């Protein structure tokens, strides 16, 4: 597929500081093409691995390689569990990622939990918490082991925070545990449907089983990290499988308690961008506080003759998303102080 760069992406008004890659919803499975649950969108299960290979080749060949790649969750498809192919498929995708010459940060989505328990994921190669940054003398910025979240610094004065959008969820947890019972109670209070994956008739359609939320503990931790970033004049990028801003997403795909997450973010000045996957269609909106919400288009529903990934170029005054295939270009200016 021919690619022509848009002129404004390369009319650089200031020096580029660094870049990072983004890719979402690979959902690989060794299966023939299929369709989504509604039967109206084609899914390219095998070809998703070729799209990933193409993205990695591109990042490896960049004249100035990205500092890291953000993998936004749903790395293999839930169908793998049905065919007892979860570990084999994960191994194939992880072997492909080994060709990447820069670190990759893995986010967990619903399809990770269709295939594996939380305990399994914690002890797997999908746990990239070892790449975290630890802030000396600030114990409040150390995340709990109860959820999968951490922060890291790819470049001075830029902090990236990876959130666990299934910290509150009925997926991947032992059904006899108090946590499962608590989350099931929350889900049933908002969703009376027999089929908990159905949003039919719901006032808050995000309360479905394939979504999840952020615990108060995780949001308190997020608040502590953002407080540190405010004080130290850092710019912050937040990463989550689930989106949190309604204007950038189908309402069925939002995190359960997206309002709570927004309230924390909006109480700080440091956050410039929030990247998510999950929707497959992508989406974008700048909120009233100047935070850019970007949902990256899903690899799984990308035709073989197209692509779905991006490279974000970071400048002192803005970020530029250079999209490939289905992923559009975007210029995201930082809010004026």
UniProtKB/Swiss-Prot annotation:
Its EC number is 3.6.1.13, 3.6.1.16, 3.6.1.53. InterPro entries: Calcineurin-like_PHP_ApaH (IPR004843), Metallo-depent_PP-like (IPR029052), MPP_ADPRM (IPR041869). Zn(2+) 1 binds at residues 25, 27, 74, 280. It catalyses: CDP-choline + H2O = phosphocholine + CMP + 2 H(+); ADP-D-ribose + H2O = D-ribose 5-phosphate + AMP + 2 H(+); CDP-glycerol + H2O = sn-glycerol 3-phosphate + CMP + 2 H(+). Zn(2+) 2 binds at residues 74, 110, 241, 278. CDD domains: MPP_Nbla03831. The modification N-acetylmethionine is found at residue 1. Keywords: Acetylation, Hydrolase, Metal-binding, Zinc. One of its GO terms (molecular function) is ADP-ribose diphosphatase activity. Its cofactor is Mg(2+). The keyword Mitochondrion does not apply. Belongs to the ADPRibase-Mn family. Monomer. Hydrolyzes ADP-ribose, IDP-ribose, CDP-glycerol, CDP-choline and CDP-ethanolamine, but not other non-reducing ADP-sugars or CDP-glucose. May be involved in immune cell signaling as suggested by the second-messenger role of ADP-ribose, which activates TRPM2 as a mediator of oxidative/nitrosative stress. PANTHER family: MANGANESE-DEPENDENT ADP-RIBOSE_CDP-ALCOHOL DIPHOSPHATASE, PTHR16509. This is Manganese-dependent ADP-ribose/CDP-alcohol diphosphatase. It comes from Bos taurus (Bovine).
């Amino acid at each position: 597929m021919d690619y022509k760069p848009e002129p404004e992406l390369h009319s650089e008004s200031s020096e580029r500081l660094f870049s990072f890659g983004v890719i979402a919803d690979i959902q690989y499975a060794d299966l023939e093409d299929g369709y989504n649950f509604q039967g109206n969108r084609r899914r390219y299960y095998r070809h998703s691995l070729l799209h990933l290979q193409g993205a990695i080749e591109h990042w490896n060949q960049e004249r100035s390689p990205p500092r890291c790649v953000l993998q936004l969750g749903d790395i293999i498809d839930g169908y793998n569990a049905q065919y007892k192919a979860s570990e084999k498929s994960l191994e194939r995708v992880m072997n492909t990622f080994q060709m990447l010459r820069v670190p990759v940060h893995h986010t967990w989505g619903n399809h990770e939990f269709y295939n594996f328990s939380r305990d399994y994921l914690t002890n797997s190669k999908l746990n990239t918490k070892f790449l975290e940054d630890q802030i000396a003398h600030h114990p409040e910025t150390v995340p709990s082991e109860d959820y999968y979240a951490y922060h890291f610094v790819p470049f001075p004065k830029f902090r990236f925070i990876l959130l666990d959008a299934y910290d509150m969820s009925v997926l991947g947890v032992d059904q006899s545990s108090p946590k499962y019972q608590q989350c099931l109670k929350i889900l049933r209070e908002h969703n009376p449907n027999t089929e908990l994956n159905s949003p039919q008739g719901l006032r808050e359609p995000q309360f479905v089983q394939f979504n999840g939320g952020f615990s108060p503990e995780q949001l308190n931790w997020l608040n502590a990290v953002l407080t540190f970033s405010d004080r130290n004049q850092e710019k912050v990028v937040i990463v989550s499988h689930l989106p949190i801003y309604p204007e950038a997403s189908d309402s069925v795909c939002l995190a359960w308690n997206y309002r709570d997450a927004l309230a924390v973010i909006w109480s700080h000045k440091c956050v410039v961008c929030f990247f998510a996957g999950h929707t497959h269609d992508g989406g974008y909106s700048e909120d009233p506080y100047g935070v850019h919400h970007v949902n990256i288009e899903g690899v799984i529903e990308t035709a073989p003759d197209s692509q779905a990934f991006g490279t974000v170029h970071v400048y002192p005054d803005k970020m530029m998303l250079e999209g490939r295939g289905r992923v559009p270009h975007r210029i995201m200016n930082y809010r004026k102080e």
